[in-house]
């Protein structure tokens, strides 16, 4: 028995399912989780001493690679001043100013502790601002585990094959309307029926929690148009895409301006943090300025703010990093496409920039239903082979691959060579 197996056995006794987030259990891929001891650059090292090339990057925030020396140094210095004060600090002001500078749609921003909290707060703000109740979300899009959004969600809920979560009262979801991702006609029909009571449309501009699913041409612009016509708040959930597709995220990449934007772990360089922000007139309804209440003891935590400020500053000062990320993405994802096509295995490789997903599917993947048509048993075999050869991929078909600045041609070559071995094994 490996040390990871021993630890998992112990964890099962004291933690539900042995993990603190379901996807980590490796249940959908028929493996036991690897317990990670440390990380450096593009590599993870488990408690048994095995090394992996990491394509999860802590689910996105380690865009500069693990254990970046500048971030590490800034965090150590911040810790020496104290871990939490429950009071205002200069660093949270600097962080807010930087986000407003980098993202033109954000005029004011409020820090919270996670992407889930950011989304939950943004929806409350949209309802308070509009005086309306209903929201539209998209099937397969995951916006955290708040009650009102666990309706036809993605990520772990999708992997588990559970459309909703037990413990969520009907009353919590009766104002949540759902449409198919990339179906602007379906959204129009919801507006036709409920237009006077739709407070917000919330969307992952690139869906990344049913695997990576790209917006079709005109979809995001269509949402913007419908929201404008109906006085509805457009919320972009950029927990995954924010500061990854570019310094101004998916909204800059696709040229669509939301009213509110939510962020998660990337603005803390992997530390627990989130934020929501947008137009000043909307954000001014938040307490203590307005009557929409939202608070948190650890919101704006000085250590998390320091880590995030350092990471965003590095990205701001090195725009060529995005060029490299895109080049590495084209190299990796493009060669994956070529290899699978030559092997004659049904697949779809959806990708944008440094974000991608390999679906074992025969037809184009463009929404929840087409994603669900993927062969999860084939993905399981693929995952196991790659993991045992030192390539750490998402332990579920319906999650994304992430690249970091630390991934270089050597890591890409090793990954592609390993993939050759997998393809040879299934011929």
Curated annotation (Swiss-Prot):
<comment type="similarity">
    <text>Belongs to the class-III pyridoxal-phosphate-dependent aminotransferase family. HemL subfamily.</text>
</comment>
<feature type="modified residue" description="N6-(pyridoxal phosphate)lysine">
    <location>
        <position position="265"/>
    </location>
</feature>
<dbReference type="InterPro" id="IPR015421">
    <property type="entry name" value="PyrdxlP-dep_Trfase_major"/>
</dbReference>
<comment type="subunit">
    <text>Homodimer.</text>
</comment>
<protein>
    <recommendedName>
        <fullName>Glutamate-1-semialdehyde 2,1-aminomutase 1</fullName>
        <ecNumber>5.4.3.8</ecNumber>
    </recommendedName>
</protein>
<dbReference type="GO" id="GO:0006782">
    <property type="term" value="P:protoporphyrinogen IX biosynthetic process"/>
</dbReference>
<dbReference type="GO" id="GO:0005737">
    <property type="term" value="C:cytoplasm"/>
</dbReference>
<keyword id="KW-0663">Pyridoxal phosphate</keyword>
<comment type="pathway">
    <text>Porphyrin-containing compound metabolism; protoporphyrin-IX biosynthesis; 5-aminolevulinate from L-glutamyl-tRNA(Glu): step 2/2.</text>
</comment>
<dbReference type="GO" id="GO:0042286">
    <property type="term" value="F:glutamate-1-semialdehyde 2,1-aminomutase activity"/>
</dbReference>
<dbReference type="InterPro" id="IPR005814">
    <property type="entry name" value="Aminotrans_3"/>
</dbReference>
<dbReference type="InterPro" id="IPR015424">
    <property type="entry name" value="PyrdxlP-dep_Trfase"/>
</dbReference>
<dbReference type="GO" id="GO:0008483">
    <property type="term" value="F:transaminase activity"/>
</dbReference>
<dbReference type="InterPro" id="IPR015422">
    <property type="entry name" value="PyrdxlP-dep_Trfase_small"/>
</dbReference>
<keyword id="KW-0413">Isomerase</keyword>
<dbReference type="GO" id="GO:0030170">
    <property type="term" value="F:pyridoxal phosphate binding"/>
</dbReference>
<dbReference type="Pfam" id="PF00202">
    <property type="entry name" value="Aminotran_3"/>
</dbReference>
<keyword id="KW-0627">Porphyrin biosynthesis</keyword>
<dbReference type="InterPro" id="IPR049704">
    <property type="entry name" value="Aminotrans_3_PPA_site"/>
</dbReference>
<keyword id="KW-0963">Cytoplasm</keyword>
<dbReference type="InterPro" id="IPR004639">
    <property type="entry name" value="4pyrrol_synth_GluAld_NH2Trfase"/>
</dbReference>
